[in-house]
Amino acid sequence: MKQAKILTKAEYKRVMHVIDAHRYAVRNRTMFALSFYAGLRACEIAGLKVGDVYGEDGTVLNTLYLESEQTKGSEQQQVIVSKQLQKQLALYAKHYKAHTKQANAPLLFSGKGGGFSAQTVINLFSRFYSKAGLKGASSHSGRRQFLTELGDKGVNVRVIQVLARHKHLSTTQRYIDYNESKLRRAVELMEIS
């Protein structure tokens, strides 16, 4: 199975530029942020409710608790919310004040007011990547980028496994890219003296 493309910074900016030209730019940036900054899958993004993300006072929660029906593995899971993601979610709440006061409403909504299915999320990612001229990118690109970048920054693979919500370490390891440059940097870390 071919893995989803990891975006360069320039490619990510290109996609954001395409999104910014869309009517629902804040909503779509939020969808991308959930993937790129929390590693959420399309089904998890589609399953989020307003109350999963915002407290009763409207503040962004620092941990999301996903119910079993919202996850791939059908188990309750938690997602740590980074400051970058909190910032985007706060902007979303500010932009869609009335919507984000309804705790049971789907977090992301269509132009018709209903929530998204996982397939709709997949299709939106695909449409924005296509408009940005990116081949090989999918709704899973943000998740793969999230996990790969954590590995590149030296985060322990067990920590990445927990953040990915994978049962098996071998699943997490498939997400983490390596190349000759990374291998060379790794061996240069050794000092014996």
Placement of each model-derived feature along the sequence:
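C-terminal catalytic core of Y-nucleophile DNA break-rejoin enzymes
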Residues: 2, 70-90, 104-124
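Basic, Lys/Arg- and aromatic-enriched nucleic-acid-binding interface segment
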Residues: 9-38, 42, 100
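Short basic/aromatic active-site micro-motif
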Residues: 28, 135-153
